[in-house]
């Protein structure tokens, strides 16, 4: 399973700002969108193109457009919403397929409680977005759901990933490609990524934050 850690200078700079313990909700939210957009650039670099002719100012001109499968963006609720606008800024025509996954804080197991998928998801490339890939439970549950719905080409974009989460996805779904801004050190005893970002959902929505 390919894992792409995107070490672009802009991503490294923005991710460094996001790691600050005293970052404001506004700044964290804006940076999540910006890094999400930059990851989208990488995750769509291999989209197929086809040529066609248009009337140009000096006569007919041959240009290119994206061909083949279209895209559906799949935010894992709730934190994935924080990356959605950044992704849609590059692929504004994409459909949004929302998946709600809750994690049991004691067992760390994931439970799916919502699915609103594009009706033609089998004909689209699915881009899952979630700020954190920690234990991998939420990601694996989401991929399970998408494949059951007929999705055949699935990619995941996360801001930070733990090795444990990457391995969980690799074991369950070796065909899924992961794009991340950083592969961090490890998980702590509570299942939080170290050094991580803290609780990304709380920081995006301005609710109570937890230490990570």
Curated annotation (Swiss-Prot):
GO molecular-function terms, A-Z: GTP binding; magnesium ion binding; uracil phosphoribosyltransferase activity
One Gene Ontology biological process: UMP salvage
Cofactor, free-text remark: Binds 1 Mg(2+) ion per subunit. The magnesium is bound as Mg-PRPP.
Pfam families associated with the record: UPRTase
Spans through the membrane: none
Activity regulation annotation text: Allosterically activated by GTP.
Alphabetical UniProt keywords: Allosteric enzyme, Glycosyltransferase, GTP-binding, Magnesium, Nucleotide-binding, Transferase
SUPFAM superfamilies reported for this sequence: PRTase-like
Binding site residues for 5-phospho-alpha-D-ribose 1-diphosphate: 78, 103, 130-138, 199
Stored NCBIfam families: PRK00129.1, upp
PANTHER family from the UniProt entry: ADENINE PHOSPHORIBOSYLTRANSFERASE (PTHR32315), URACIL PHOSPHORIBOSYLTRANSFERASE, CHLOROPLASTIC (PTHR32315:SF4)
Family that this chain belongs to: Belongs to the UPRTase family.
Role according to the record: Catalyzes the conversion of uracil and 5-phospho-alpha-D-ribose 1-diphosphate (PRPP) to UMP and diphosphate.
Name of the protein in its database record: Uracil phosphoribosyltransferase
Annotated source species: Pseudomonas paraeruginosa (strain DSM 24068 / PA7)
